[in-house]
């Protein structure tokens, strides 16, 4: 969707997709807008509650079955395990993705890791293709005039023309670009708290080969799961940047995370969007 600042200002229904790395402020902004008549569509929440709900539960049950006491209760239907995924608690999704490496340290085999990556990829594609339906639900069913699509950090990795076409046709795409300070903070955060991530398979294969050669490892089972995530995150971050930039160039607009940090209301966000439209060629 391409708009001039004047056209955006006149919209009675604003529909926006936020893109960017996890930690740049997408969910912070979405939560703020949610309090001011915006419907918050969380891609990760949709993934966890609709498309990966059963695999997530199966994974939890598989872990529980390793505990004799819980195994007996599960096999006799004496207990029930449910997902408690909320927009503010998406831990079950990242826990399902898992980390590659030594099983004694909670790591997954390469085969299992890639299986889960593939499931997540398909789930994210479907969650983004659901956006038009939820735009209608938000307005007709729930009465929200505006819609914010809080897309996952890995949307740039999907390589799905259909997803980009759908988002560009139905929403204004805004890429939140990390400032240099924000970039350092995100990398430092990954060092402190390495979390499961989605990788394109070609990227994973290339970086895994480099990592294992650099650590002089023969088998994936020798990998320290957290060490690999710490090592690979800066490479992933830099690999995603040109992908985000290409999406913004072809389909949307860019704002800086430092600009986003200055706003505290939907009105201020609207001004920021208009500024982005103006500086990127719309008049």
Listing of model-derived features with the role each one plays in the protein:
Residues 25:
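Conserved glycine(s) of the Walker
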Residues 29, 33:
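Hydrophobic positions on the alpha1 helix immediately C-terminal to the Walker A/P-loop
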Residues 37-52:
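Short beta-strand-centered segment that lines the nucleotide-binding/catalytic pocket of NTP-utilizing
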Residues 52, 57-162:
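ATP-dependent small-molecule kinase phosphotransfer cores
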Residues 150-151, 166-219:
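Conserved phosphate-donor/acceptor-positioning beta-strand/loop module used by diverse small-molecule
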Residues 217-283:
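NTP-dependent small-molecule kinase module
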């Amino acid at each position: 969707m391409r708009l001039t600042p004047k056209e955006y200002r006149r919209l009675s229904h604003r529909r926006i997709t936020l893109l960017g790395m996890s930690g740049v402020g997408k969910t912070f902004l979405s939560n703020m807008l949610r309090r001011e008549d915006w419907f918050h569509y969380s891609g990760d929440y949709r993934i966890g509650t609709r498309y990966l709900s059963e695999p997530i539960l199966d994974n939890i049950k598989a872990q529980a079955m390793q505990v004799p006491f819980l195994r007996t209760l599960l096999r006799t239907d004496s207990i029930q395990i449910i997902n408690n995924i909320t927009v503010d608690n998406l831990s079950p999704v990242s826990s399902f993705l898992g980390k590659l490496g030594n099983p004694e340290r909670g790591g997954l085999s390469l085969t299992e890791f890639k299986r889960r990556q593939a499931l997540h990829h398909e789930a994210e594609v479907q969650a983004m293709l659901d956006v038009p339906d939820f735009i209608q639900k938000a307005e007709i069913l729930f009465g929200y005039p505006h819609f914010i699509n809080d897309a996952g950090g890995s949307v740039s990795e999907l390589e799905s023309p259909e997803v980009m076409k759908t988002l560009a046709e139905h929403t204004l795409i805004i890429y939140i670009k990390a400032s240099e300070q924000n970039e350092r903070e995100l990398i430092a955060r990954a060092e402190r708290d390495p979390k499961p991530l989605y990788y394109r398979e070609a990227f994973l294969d290339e970086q895994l080969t480099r990592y294992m050669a650099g650590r002089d490892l023969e088998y994936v089972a020798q990998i320290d799961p957290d060490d690999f995530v710490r090592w690979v995150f800066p490479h992933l971050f830099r690999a995603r940047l040109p992908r985000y930039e290409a999406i913004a160039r072809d389909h949307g607009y860019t704002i800086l995370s430092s600009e986003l940090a200055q706003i505290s209301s939907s009105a201020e966000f609207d001004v920021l969007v208009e500024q982005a439209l103006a500086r990127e060629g719309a008049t």
